[in-house]
Amino acid sequence: MGFTDETVRFDFDDNRKKAISETLETVYRALEEKGYNPINQIVGYLLSGDPAYIPRYQDARNLIRRHERDEIMEELTKYYLANHGIDIK
């Protein structure tokens, strides 16, 4: 792969979205594998900030704590609205 003379744009927002998405997928699977209701547990964590809602299994607790709760909620809200026909600016 060669280099180009054109400026490459780095979009931090896209990388953040991807990281949050991957984290939520991992956490969801870990909760499911442990027999919990993943939605209830994630909502409990987001509302309370108490990491005890998320198991240490598959490093899920450490992964989710890498993101600010408000950033996770922001991405979830944007995703929901965008998938319901709302143009997010």
UniProtKB/Swiss-Prot annotation:
It comes from the Bacteria. Pfam families: IreB. HAMAP family: UPF0297. Belongs to the UPF0297 family. This is UPF0297 protein EF_1202. It comes from Enterococcus faecalis (strain ATCC 700802 / V583).
